[in-house]
Amino acid sequence: MKFNYYAFKAIYLHEMDRFKRTLMQSLLSPVLSTSLYFIVFGSVIGGYVENIDGISYGSYIVPGLLMLTLLTQSITNTSFGIFFPKFNGTIYEILAAPISTLEIVLAFVGAGATKTLIVGTVIFITANFFVEVDVTYPFLVIFLLVLVSFTFALFGFLIGLMSSDFEQMSIIPTLIITPMVFLGGSLYSLEMLPQFWQTVTYFNPVVYLINGLRFAFYGVSDFNIWISISSMVAFLLVCVFLVLVLLKKGYNIKA
């Protein structure tokens, strides 16, 4: 079947237009909230904390805070993107249109990842006003940002498909992802923890993402970079499989 570019473009641009209409909430809100972290932890508290692995504390926390934004925004953007058509009934028009399941997923996930990358880029630029950020491997940073954005946009699409109301959609970003980021070494090195808590932290998947991005920024990490990349690719493939299967079966969509 030939790829329906126009149908893909219509959904993608519709999602991007929604991003423009809610610019205050979609862009300014996460940028301002993250800036507060840079001010409090980077500029104020950072002046009283010793360097970690030869990196100033303010600079050290940049990858963790950036990862927090990437995860929450990619999940929220895409989950709401697919849930709204379910909520107002327009999802049936999309399913009835001459567009494949893959094209629907690519359009929503592509738009969600694009919005996340825009927010992430603005936050990265903003971070430079508060702390010194020197990137060691810029191409690896770009690769990881794109990989994380698309992977968790897919995860957000999956959440949107499985959710029956707005409350269910907010549970994972608020009660699961955010605590996992803060407990995953976003504001500290794992070597600062007692041995028991270091072992517990190894079971937190987000810690590998944060360390992967920190390695791309500064060349330091608590884990091998390939562990971070391979775990992310594996999670991406699982999300692709689940989304395509559930959407094709019409899970939580078709009556």
Predicted regions and their residues:
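Hydrophobic transmembrane alpha-helices and immediately adjacent juxtamembrane helices
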Residues: M1-P138, F143-A255
